């Protein structure tokens, strides 16, 4: 609900021209120890391609901007060789951990907008956040750090709006009367494939 609400604000121009974004997928110690996640040959990479892509996709979607001009990034393999690591899914085998444990990027878009990308499976941070975004525009900004927060100026004062996106206390349904977001996403994708156009 928060992503769809924020997307509508962005589409309606409520935040103005979006020129800065932050794509965040940071885990403290949540390295997936099953399957081929840790194998560079079979997986292709670590947290950047596993969870970082979701946060980046969300940010690009909010900004409606998919044309990068320049990208600079760094990857780290600083914590993967530790033992007794406090991982949420048990200790990993350092010998089999051949992908990065953290990756960061700086993206400049063709129109000059800038996006910071942060992703990790293992990073010494206090507040992990996964698949969230922050966008800043000329009329306001928004972040998902602790639920959706929209900031703007009203009557010469700084304001923060925290929309109530709950369903009104119905425990078995967390929507707001609109259609399930996964159904909307699938419908948009199918429409794009069938009618040969970019997803909307």
Describe every region a protein language model picked out.
Residues 1-97, 196:
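Predominantly a Rossmann-like dinucleotide-binding segment in NAD(P)-dependent oxidoreductases
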Residues 6, 105, 115-117:
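Membrane-embedded beta-strands that build the outer-membrane beta-barrel scaffold
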Residues 18-21, 71, 116-119, 145-147:
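Beta-strand scaffold of nucleotide-dependent catalytic cores
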Residues 29-31, 124-127:
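Short glycine/serine/proline-enriched coil/turn segments at secondary-structure junctions
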Residues 47, 51, 103-105, 113:
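Glycine/small-residue-rich pyrophosphate-binding loop that anchors the diphosphate of NDP-sugar donors
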Residues 75-97, 104-111, 123, 130-200:
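C-terminal glycine/acidic-rich active-site capping loop/insertion
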